[in-house]
């Protein structure tokens, strides 16, 4: 009986070790990969945490637009640039905010604010 308890305990321990290492969070995309995936002038969809959907267009020359797909949300334009970890945007005359892009499923990416040590998802991009 003690042998079976030991074997069961060992099995649980091994499962925990391999399970902890087998599941890892996706790494943020490298800035050049963000550029070639999204900043090409081709439209893609962004969904805010509240569910508002926008058609986004980031052009290679550093300009961007967003247009609401539904009636909620406002159309706006701004500029973008790559940084060491991801990219930064400035909408209209607002101050710049910086983000990373993390793959989150097939043809889906989480856009996360990088201003703090805790990642905050501000949109989900899809193609």
Q: What feature does the model see in each segment?
A:
Residues 2, 7, 19-77, 81-127:
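Lipid interaction determinants
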Residues 7-14:
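Sec-dependent N-terminal signal peptides
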């Amino acid at each position: 009986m003690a042998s079976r308890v030991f074997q069961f305990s060992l099995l649980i321990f091994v499962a925990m070790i391999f399970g902890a290492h087998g599941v890892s969070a996706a790494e943020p995309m490298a800035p050049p990969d963000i550029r070639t995936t999204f900043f090409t002038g081709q439209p893609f969809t962004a969904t805010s945490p509240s569910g508002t959907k926008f058609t986004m267009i980031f052009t290679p020359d550093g300009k961007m637009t967003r247009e609401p797909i539904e009636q909620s949300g406002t159309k706006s334009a701004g500029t973008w640039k790559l940084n060491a970890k991801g990219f930064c945007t400035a909408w209209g005359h607002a101050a710049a905010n910086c983000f990373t892009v993390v793959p989150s499923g097939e043809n889906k990416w989480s856009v996360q604010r990088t201003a703090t040590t805790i990642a905050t998802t501000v949109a989900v991009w899809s193609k």
